[in-house]
C-alpha cells in the first residue's frame, strides 16, 4: 500500500500519521488502515494501528492535541463603565502575535483550558470574562450589558494592553461576538477562527428553546420545560424563564438558572459529558450563564435586524477566516454555519463529522488547533 506521510510539530514532541494514499486530496481520503507514531527526542514509537471509520474522513487529517496547560504571566481588572469591571489575563509569549479568546454564553466566562488552543511559543494569548461573567464584576449583572457594550469593551481592552491588532477566536456566542466586533473594527483583526456558529436569529433560538432540539433530547427537554407551569408557558419558554431569572426571590432565580444551564450542558456534546452537566449545580456559574444568556436572547442580541451579521459580511470578507462546525451540533445547528458559508464562501468551513457543539470534543479541538497553526504561517 502506498502511504502519505503527514507530520506536524508540537514541541517538544510531534505526531506523525501514516495514511493510505487512495486519493490525491487529503480532505477526501477514504477509510482505511492508519498508524499513529509519536517522535520525541529522536526516538519513535508506534502507538496504535486502527481502522478509520467513514465519519472520520474529513476530520482526521492534521489532527493535533491541545497544548500543555500554562499559567498567565499577567492579569488584571479593567473598569469599562461606571458599573462593570472586567477580569483579563495574558499567557504565552509576551511579544508574540496577539490573539483574543471570546467565550460563549453569553455569561459562560473563561477557563484555564481555553489557553490550550494556542501555541504559547508563538501567541500572546488574551482571555477576559465578559460583563457579569466569570471573575468580572458585578456578577450576573444585566445593567449596561449588550452586544455593543461588549464590542466596545474588546476595543478598550485592546487599547489598554497596547495591542495594535489581533487574531480573534470565538465559539458559540463567542462566534457571534467575534463577527459583531470584526464587522465594527475590521482594521484591528488579523484573522478569525470561529466555532459552532451562532448568528442569534429567531429560528436558532426557536430551534433550541421552543421544541426543535427536543426531538433529539426529549428526556432532557421535558425536565427543562416542566419547570414552567403549563398555564405560564404561553408562546415562549424563553420569556417564561426570563420572568423567573429576574424574580425578586433568589431561590426562584437559582432554580430557573440550574434548569436552563442543565438543558444546554446536556446537549453540548455528542455524548453527554457528566462533568459538563454538573456545572448546572454551581449556582454562581449557572446564575450568570442563564441570566445573561436569557437577557440577550429576549432582546434579540441587541441587533437591529434578524440577519444583521449576515448582512454585514462584506465588511470582513477580506479577513482570513476558518469556521469549525460539528455536524451534530444541537445547540448551534449547522444551518447557521452553512448560511454563513454561503454568504461568505471565502471563509474556510471545516465540518467535524464526529462531534456536537463543545470546543472540548476531540475532533473540534483538533481542528481549532490546526486552524491556529495555519494562522501562524500567515502571520509569520
UniProtKB/Swiss-Prot annotation:
One Gene Ontology cellular component annotation held by this UniProt entry: mitochondrion
Keywords: Aminopeptidase, Cytoplasm, Hydrolase, Protease
EC number: 3.4.11.5
Signal sequence, start to end: none
Compartment(s): Cytoplasm
Catalysed reactions listed for this entry: Release of N-terminal proline from a peptide
The keyword Cytoplasm is annotated on this UniProt entry: yes
GO biological process annotation, one example: proteolysis
Occurrences of domain AB hydrolase-1 (ranges): 98-360
Active site (UniProt): 172, 329, 357
Keyword hit for Protease: yes
Gene3D superfamilies xref list: alpha/beta hydrolase
InterPro entries recorded: AB_hydrolase_1, AB_hydrolase_fold, Peptidase_S33, Pro_iminopeptidase
GO molecular function: aminopeptidase activity
SUPFAM superfamilies: alpha/beta-Hydrolases
Family per similarity comment: Belongs to the peptidase S33 family.
Function: Specifically catalyzes the removal of N-terminal proline residues from peptides.
Protein name, as recorded: Proline iminopeptidase
Amino acid at each position: 500500500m502506498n502511504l502519505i506521510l503527514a507530520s506536524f510539530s508540537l514541541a517538544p514532541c510531534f505526531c506523525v500519521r501514516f495514511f493510505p494514499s487512495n486519493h490525491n486530496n487529503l480532505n477526501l481520503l477514504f477509510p482505511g488502515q492508519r498508524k499513529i507514531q509519536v517522535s520525541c527526542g529522536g526516538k519513535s514509537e508506534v502507538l496504535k494501528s486502527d481502522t478509520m471509520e467513514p465519519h472520520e474522513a474529513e476530520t482526521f487529517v492534521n489532527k493535533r492535541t491541545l497544548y500543555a496547560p500554562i499559567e498567565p504571566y499577567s492579569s488584571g481588572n479593567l473598569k469599562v463603565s461606571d458599573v462593570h469591571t472586567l477580569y483579563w489575563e495574558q499567557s504565552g509569549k509576551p511579544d508574540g502575535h496577539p490573539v483574543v479568546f471570546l467565550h460563549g454564553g453569553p455569561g459562560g466566562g473563561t477557563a484555564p483550558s481555553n489557553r490550550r488552543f494556542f501555541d504559547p511559543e508563538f501567541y500572546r494569548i488574551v482571555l477576559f470574562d465578559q460583563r457579569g461573567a466569570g471573575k468580572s464584576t458585578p456578577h450576573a449583572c444585566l445593567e449596561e450589558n449588550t452586544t455593543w457594550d461588549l464590542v466596545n469593551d474588546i476595543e478598550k481592552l485592546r487599547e489598554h494592553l497596547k495591542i495594535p491588532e489581533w487574531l480573534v477566536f470565538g465559539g458559540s456566542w463567542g462566534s457571534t461576538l467575534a463577527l459583531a466586533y470584526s464587522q465594527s473594527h475590521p482594521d484591528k483583526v488579523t484573522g478569525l477562527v470561529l466555532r459552532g456558529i451562532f448568528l442569534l436569529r429567531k429560528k436558532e433560538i426557536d430551534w433550541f428553546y421552543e421544541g426543535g432540539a427536543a426531538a433529539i433530547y426529549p428526556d432532557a427537554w421535558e425536565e427543562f420545560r416542566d419547570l414552567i407551569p403549563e398555564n405560564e408557558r404561553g408562546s415562549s419558554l424563553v420569556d417564561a424563564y426570563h420572568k423567573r431569572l429576574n424574580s425578586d426571590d433568589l431561590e426562584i432565580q437559582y432554580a430557573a438558572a440550574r434548569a436552563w444551564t442543565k438543558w444546554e450542558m446536556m446537549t453540548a456534546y455528542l455524548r453527554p459529558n457528566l462533568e459538563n452537566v454538573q456545572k448546572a449545580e454551581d449556582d454562581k456559574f449557572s446564575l450568570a450563564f442563564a441570566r445573561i444568556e436569557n437577557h440577550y436572547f429576549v432582546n434579540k442580541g441587541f441587533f437591529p435586524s434578524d440577519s444583521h451579521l449576515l448582512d454585514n459580511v462584506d465588511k470582513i470578507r477580506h479577513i482570513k477566516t476558518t469556521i469549525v462546525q460539528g455536524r451534530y451540533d444541537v445547540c448551534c445547528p449547522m444551518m447557521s454555519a452553512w448560511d454563513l458559508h454561503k454568504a461568505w464562501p471565502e471563509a474556510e468551513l471545516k465540518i467535524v463529522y464526529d462531534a456536537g457543539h463543545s470546543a472540548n470534543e476531540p475532533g473540534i479541538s483538533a481542528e481549532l488547533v490546526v486552524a491556529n497553526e495555519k494562522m501562524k504561517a500567515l502571520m509569520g
